[in-house]
C-alpha cells in the first residue's frame, strides 16, 4: 500500500485495485470523543457508499470496513477537472474515449449523477470536478462530508457550491451544461435562488 494523500481528516492509501481511507486521530480531542466521532463518521460514509452501490450510482464498490478504515474499489481513470482543463491526457489509455465526449456530455452526465443522489436524499457535501473520475464512465468519489437530507436547503447548498467550483476553476458556461443533466424543480429552484443571493451578499 502506498500513502497518496494525508489530510486533516484522513489518510488515503492505494494498491493496484484498492483504496483504503483511514481516519486520523486528532490529538487536541479527548480520546473517547475522538474515537466516537471517527467511528460515527466512518459508519456514515460506509452507509452512503453502500447505498450508492445499491442504487447503481457510479461510485467505488464497497469492500469492507473496521472502526476507522474503509476499503473500497480504486477507480482507475482521470479526474474530470483535468479533462475539462485539457490537462494530462496525451499518454492516457482513456484518451480515445474521452475525445469522443464533449465537455457538455461530461457535465450532463455529472448532472445525472448528482440528480440521482439528491433524488435519494444523499448530499455529497464537497462537489468539485476533482471528485468525479472518468474511466469507462464517470464515477463520483469522496464521501467524507456526505450526509442524508430531504431538505431543499441542503440540496441547494450542494448545487451552489458546485456552481462556484465550476465558475472559479473552469468556465461559467459549464453551469448550464450541468443543469442540462440535473432538472431543478420549482421549490428547489426557489431555494437555490435564495442561496445564490445570500452568497453574493457575502462576497
UniProtKB/Swiss-Prot annotation:
Detail the disulphide connectivity of this chain as listed in its UniProt entry: none
UniProt GO molecular function: ATP binding; hydrolase activity; protein serine kinase activity; protein serine/threonine kinase activity
InterPro entries hit by this protein: Bud32, Kinase-like_dom_sf, Prot_kinase_dom, RIO_dom, Tyr_kinase_AS
- EC identifiers of the protein: 3.6.-.-, 2.7.11.1
UniProt GO cellular component terms: chromosome, telomeric region; cytosol; nucleus
Q: Which domain of life is it from?
A: Eukaryota
Keywords carried by this UniProt record: Activator, ATP-binding, Chromosome, Cytoplasm, Hydrolase, Kinase, Nucleotide-binding, Nucleus, Phosphoprotein, Serine/threonine-protein kinase, Telomere, Transcription, Transcription regulation, Transferase, tRNA processing
Name its cellular compartments.
Answer: Cytoplasm; Nucleus; Chromosome, Telomere
Q: Which reaction does it catalyse?
A: L-seryl-[protein] + ATP = O-phospho-L-seryl-[protein] + ADP + H(+); L-threonyl-[protein] + ATP = O-phospho-L-threonyl-[protein] + ADP + H(+)
Q: Where is the catalytic site?
A: 126
Q: Where is the Protein kinase domain?
A: 1-203
Which residues are recorded as binding ATP? Answer: 4-12, 26
Q: Might you name a Gene Ontology BP term for this protein?
A: tRNA processing
Q: How does it assemble?
A: Component of the EKC/KEOPS complex composed of at least BUD32, CGI121, GON7, KAE1 and PCC1; the whole complex dimerizes.
Question: Which family, according to UniProt?
Answer: Belongs to the protein kinase superfamily. BUD32 family.
Q: What role is this protein assigned?
A: Component of the EKC/KEOPS complex that is required for the formation of a threonylcarbamoyl group on adenosine at position 37 (t(6)A37) in tRNAs that read codons beginning with adenine. The complex is probably involved in the transfer of the threonylcarbamoyl moiety of threonylcarbamoyl-AMP (TC-AMP) to the N6 group of A37. BUD32 has ATPase activity in the context of the EKC/KEOPS complex and likely plays a supporting role to the catalytic subunit KAE1. The EKC/KEOPS complex also promotes both telomere uncapping and telomere elongation.
Fill in the domain comment: This protein is considered an atypical serine/threonine kinase, because it lacks the conventional structural elements necessary for the substrate recognition as well as a lysine residue that in all other serine/threonine kinases participates in the catalytic event. BUD32 has protein kinase activity in vitro, but in the context of the EKC/KEOPS complex, the catalytic subunit KAE1 switches the activity of BUD32 from kinase into ATPase.
Q: What is this protein called?
A: EKC/KEOPS complex subunit BUD32
Per UniProt, what is the name of the gene that codes for the protein in this document?
Answer: BUD32
Amino acid at each position: 500500500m502506498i500513502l497518496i494523500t494525508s489530510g486533516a481528516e484522513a489518510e488515503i492509501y492505494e494498491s493496484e485495485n484498492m483504496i483504503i481511507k483511514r481516519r486520523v486521530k486528532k490529538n487536541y480531542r479527548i480520546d473517547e470523543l475522538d474515537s466516537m466521532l471517527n467511528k460515527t463518521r466512518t459508519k456514515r460514509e460506509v452507509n452512503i457508499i453502500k447505498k450508492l452501490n445499491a442504487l447503481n450510482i457510479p461510485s467505488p464498490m464497497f469492500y469492507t470496513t473496521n472502526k476507522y478504515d474503509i476499503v473500497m474499489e480504486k477507480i482507475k481513470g482521470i479526474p474530470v477537472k483535468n479533462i475539462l482543463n485539457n490537462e494530462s491526457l496525451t499518454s492516457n489509455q482513456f484518451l480515445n474515449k474521452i475525445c469522443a465526449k464533449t465537455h457538455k456530455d461530461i457535465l450532463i452526465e455529472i448532472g445525472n449523477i448528482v440528480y440521482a443522489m439528491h433524488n435519494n436524499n444523499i448530499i455529497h457535501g464537497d462537489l468539485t470536478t476533482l471528485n468525479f473520475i472518468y474511466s469507462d464512465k464517470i464515477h463520483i468519489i469522496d464521501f467524507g462530508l456526505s450526509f442524508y437530507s430531504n431538505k431543499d436547503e441542503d440540496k441547494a447548498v450542494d448545487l451552489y457550491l458546485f456552481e462556484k467550483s465550476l465558475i472559479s476553476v473552469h468556465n461559467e458556461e459549464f453551469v448550464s451544461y450541468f443543469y442540462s443533466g440535473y432538472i431543478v424543480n420549482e421549490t428547489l429552484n426557489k431555494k437555490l435562488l435564495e442561496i445564490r443571493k445570500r452568497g453574493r451578499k457575502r462576497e
